Amino acid sequence: MSETAPKPETVEIYTDGACSGNPGPGGWGAILRFKGIEKELKGGESPTTNNRMEMMAVLVALNTLTRSCAVDVYTDSEYVKKGMTEWLRGWKARGWKTADKKPVKNDDLWKALDEAAARHKVSWHWVKGHAGHPENERADALAREGIADLRART
């Protein structure tokens, strides 16, 4: 009888970004869950865009992990999911140009996300935003707190 290797422990990451105006002041939020323990992260910057805040949420969350691991990322951003799973390979092959030869928008964050994701075994999942998904709703609240914190500092 052969033993099967146990499934590696998986970190769950739930992310969201928000922007008050696009561009405008923006915030991001992330929840990391591992073995029932949660860590919440949030931040903001201005001026920025909603897409950049969606990306920052994932980037900061992945960079918070201190060792390589299996990760399930849950995002309501098709831009982030498709960018990482469908578009990134082509952009890199074309020297960070789109299929119609234009520079990739947010290439600084795409490069950083690519590097951060490469340190882990990441599975990307899309969830419908504002549809009652508890972790997505919490990540959205954190992103909005990120905007509020930013405004309180300025």
UniProtKB/Swiss-Prot annotation:
Catalytic activity: Endonucleolytic cleavage to 5'-phosphomonoester
Cofactor: Mg(2+)
Localization, UniProt: Cytoplasm
GO BP, one annotated term: DNA replication, removal of RNA primer
Phylogenetic classification of the source organism: Bacteria, Pseudomonadati, Pseudomonadota, Alphaproteobacteria, Rhodospirillales
EC number: 3.1.26.4
Subunit structure: Monomer.
Biological role: Endonuclease that specifically degrades the RNA of RNA-DNA hybrids.
SUPFAM superfamilies membership: Ribonuclease H-like (SSF53098)
GO cellular component, one term: cytoplasm
Cofactor binding: number and manner: Binds 1 Mg(2+) ion per subunit. May bind a second metal ion at a regulatory site, or after substrate binding.
Organism: Paramagnetospirillum magneticum (strain ATCC 700264 / AMB-1)
Top-level lineage group: Bacteria
Name of the featured protein: Ribonuclease H
Gene expressing this chain: rnhA
